[in-house]
């Protein structure tokens, strides 16, 4: 199974290492046509206003929205911002894939970044992980279809809806594989079930 990593900016190489640990094939996505050759997509961290300009210039908004209708998408940090319904910054154009509103850089500057122990609930199982927050966005509203997988300081920091998963932290920096596995093995299996049932 080939998983695309949006390679416009951000530290996308570490996501590739996580995918390889799960026996998934990483593929860098730099052009909209690259989406035709992958079965899922990661929108990595970066700077969300810059990402808005790069995605707009390359025509990614329409192509990712269409791709996400039938394929799993995972967004981390700025990737979560891009997947949200709305960010509290008019410079940012979002994809509207997750029914959440976001406040960007809620954890402060990069020097205030931190690593925290979180309890994550996936598939009815709870497990602790170390989560690295870097200028992390904060979810300030979420809709009824959102499944909260983890919270930090009383706010959701890992959410899922349908085939889409958003995280305000960077699991790839701590070698955490459970979210990539959930997005591209568990959620992807739902697609196969739908196809078989059709």
What does each of the following model-derived ranges do?
Residues 1-2, 126-129, 159-165:
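Beta-strand-turn-beta hairpins that frame and shape the catalytic cleft
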Residues 89-155:
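Pocket-forming structural segment of enzyme catalytic cores
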């Amino acid at each position: 199974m080939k998983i695309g990593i949006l390679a416009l900016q951000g530290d996308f190489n570490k996501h590739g290492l996580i995918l390889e640990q799960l026996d998934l094939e990483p593929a860098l996505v730099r052009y909209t046509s690259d989406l035709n050759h992958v079965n899922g997509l990661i929108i990595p961290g970066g700077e969300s206003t810059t990402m808005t300009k790069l995605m707009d210039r390359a025509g990614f908004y329409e192509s990712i929205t269409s791709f996400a209708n039938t394929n799993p998408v995972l967004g981390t940090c700025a990737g979560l911002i891009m997947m949200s319904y709305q960010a509290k910054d008019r410079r940012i154009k979002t994809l509207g894939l997750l029914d959440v509103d976001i406040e960007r850089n809620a954890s402060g500057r990069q020097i205030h970044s931190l690593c925290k122990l979180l309890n994550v609930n996936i598939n009815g199982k709870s497990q602790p992980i170390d989560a690295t927050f870097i200028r992390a966005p904060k979810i300030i509203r979420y809709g009824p279809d959102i499944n909260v997988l983890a919270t930090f300081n009383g706010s959701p920091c890992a959410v899922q809806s349908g085939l889409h998963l958003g995280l305000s932290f960077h699991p790839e920096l701590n070698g955490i594989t459970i979210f990539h596995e959930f997005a591209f093995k568990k959620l992807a299996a739902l697609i196969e079930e739908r196809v078989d049932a059709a």
